Regions:
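Classical Sec-dependent N-terminal signal peptides that target proteins to the secretory pathway
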Residues: 1-24
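A generic "folded-domain core" signal
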Residues: 22-185
Length: 185
């Protein structure tokens, strides 16, 4: 009996060590939903957290909106005050802010949706590609700011996304967007 317990514990420890070094796969979803197309990728730290790049036909598919999500178990009760607020973040080494645009109750936690804004697609795509290639990562950390403590609202304050397939995914999203019947001509 002790032998089985001994072997089971060693096997469990071995699996935990091996699986902790597993690397997240870069799986992109590129599709159209209603009038817009998007390309999204799952996070490496929290797989369910997505980073999405959205294109709208009314912009002639020339602008890109960026959104990302953070799931949290923390609910201090006043999370609704974050809506429409700019929360301090660090994008790789760059301190900036992201606007909270939606908070959705999910299971026993909350999914907080942020936006970094709307940008001209060519310039933004080039900037993201250059930033990712320079740092070899695309990482967002929610950080403390004036009258804001990140750990009050977020149990995990950091996530990163693989963007190796960013350019082909955006090109595919542009093609989908341009095929929209609602594109301005």
């Amino acid at each position: 009996m002790r032998w089985i317990l001994f072997i089971s514990l060693h096997l469990l420890v071995f699996l935990i060590i091996i699986l902790s070094y597993a690397e997240a796969k870069e799986e992109w979803t590129v599709t159209r939903v209603e009038d817009y197309s998007y390309a999204s990728v799952s996070g490496e730290i929290q797989y369910g957290d997505k980073f999405a790049f959205i294109l709208m036909p009314e912009d002639n598919c020339n602008k890109i909106t960026t959104m990302f999500s953070f799931y949290t178990w923390n609910d201090p009760g006043d999370y609704r005050q974050l809506l429409d607020k700019h929360i301090p973040i660090k994008l790789n080494d760059i301190e900036t802010t992201a606007e909270v645009i939606q908070i959705i109750p999910v299971y026993d936690g909350l999914k907080v949706i942020f936006t970094l804004g709307v940008y001209p697609i060519k310039e933004y795509t080039y900037m993201i590609h250059t930033l990712y290639n320079h740092h070899k990562k695309y990482e967002i950390e929610i950080i403390d700011g004036i009258n804001f403590k990140a750990n009050k609202y977020f149990d995990i304050t950091i996530n990163r996304w693989k963007l190796e397939k960013f350019i082909p995914s955006i090109k595919k999203a542009i093609n989908i967007c341009r095929k929209s019947p609602n594109i301005n001509t």
